[in-house]
Amino acid sequence: MAVIFRSISGCITSAESVLITQQSHEELYRVLRHNKQVSSTEQKVVVVSVSPQSRASLAAHYGIGSSEVARKLTSFLKHLGVHHVFDTAFSRSFSLIESQREFLQRFSQREADKKALPMLASACPGWICYAEKTHGEFILPYISTTRSPQQIMGSLVKGYFASQKGVSPQMIYHVTVMPCYDKKLEASRPDFYLSEHETREVDCVITSGEVLKMLEEEKVSLRDVQPAPLDTMFSNVCGEELLGHAGSGSGGYLHHIYKHAAKQLFGVDVDELTYKTMKNKDFQEVTLEKDGQVLLKFAAVYGFRNIQNLVQKLKRGKSPYHFVEVMACPSGCLNGGGQLKPSADQSNKELLQQVEEVYRSEHPSVPEDDSQVAELYQSWLESVGEEKARQLLHTQYHAVEKTANGLSIKW
């Protein structure tokens, strides 16, 4: 248990353990089997949304490119009976745009609201779980309300996609493939349950490792699978290649918010970000200075020891940052607990390096320049910052009282 839930603070409740065990590749198989036994009108539309980090993990394992993994995985999943395979880099574009917008808003309110800054990233569910359980009301106002790419994809699939297809959200079975077990907990949050339709926005989360298990159970090597065309509806596609985002392997939040804020607030065009390593490689700073004055100070803080230091600084009123990209796992999402493990003749460090190389090989796209994203802001959300966008692309957090079983996690 401690290996699986390595990023969560304190204890795992019994209820959370149950929620997680309900989500596995066996559940996906169960739905696919059920679809084959019922009439077409009773079948669920099965959608699988794959994270770029999971693609990179599988690509490093098989020694093939990330976009090739996407095409082959699309083929494999559709052969099993999946109807659509999407890419969460697409929903991440919304997450990055909303995070940029939210940061500018918080920056403008920093004098009136002492907890507007630093804005703390919200895409990591291990970090959110820790914040809610351990620091509650103190820390939550600092955390960005922008949903993670997984949960924005949940909104897209059970909202826009369902309406476009003329299907009730409860007749869609939405699976995500993630680098992290804690994403199963995130999908189970009551905030992401559509009570009107009695369905979750994300029904099941499986890890990169569980996808490998599926391939092994089917006695298939991804190398040997005939590729299929990529679904273009919710994917960042250029020709036959998937596009990624610049910045870290955890989504590039610091990179995109920093460049956007520098331009919008101070008229500064930043080409390259210069990272300064602090106590260790999992704690880095980026500073924008002009005429000797610090205009922006951002940090990337990964792993719980660094996170604990950050929280203590906040509590003492000593944090110098405007924004912090916070991730529970050392080295971030590419090193998530649900990623593939190294082979016998490979170290963790070597594997991580390969995964990072694959991830960075994807051509980066700029979220604001994505015409499909811009079109959806108009047709689905009725433009950036409007009430519908706040409802479907943002969330809230809840301080949790400390009642749990004894599954204590050590970092």
Swiss-Prot record:
[4Fe-4S] cluster 2 binds at residues 124, 180, 329, 333. It comes from the Eukaryota. One of its GO terms (cellular component) is cytosolic [4Fe-4S] assembly targeting complex. Component of the cytosolic iron-sulfur protein assembly (CIA) complex, a multiprotein complex that mediates the incorporation of iron-sulfur cluster into extramitochondrial Fe/S proteins. One of its GO terms (molecular function) is metal ion binding. [4Fe-4S] cluster 1 binds at residue 11. This is Cytosolic Fe-S cluster assembly factor narfl. SUPFAM superfamilies: Fe-only hydrogenase. Component of the CIA complex. The keyword Iron applies. The gene is narfl. InterPro entries: Cytosolic_Fe-S_CAF (IPR050340), Fe_hydrogenase (IPR009016), Fe_hydrogenase_lsu_C (IPR004108), Fe_hydrogenase_ssu (IPR003149). One of its GO terms (biological process) is regulation of angiogenesis. Keywords: 4Fe-4S, Iron, Iron-sulfur, Metal-binding. The keyword S-adenosyl-L-methionine does not apply. Belongs to the NARF family.
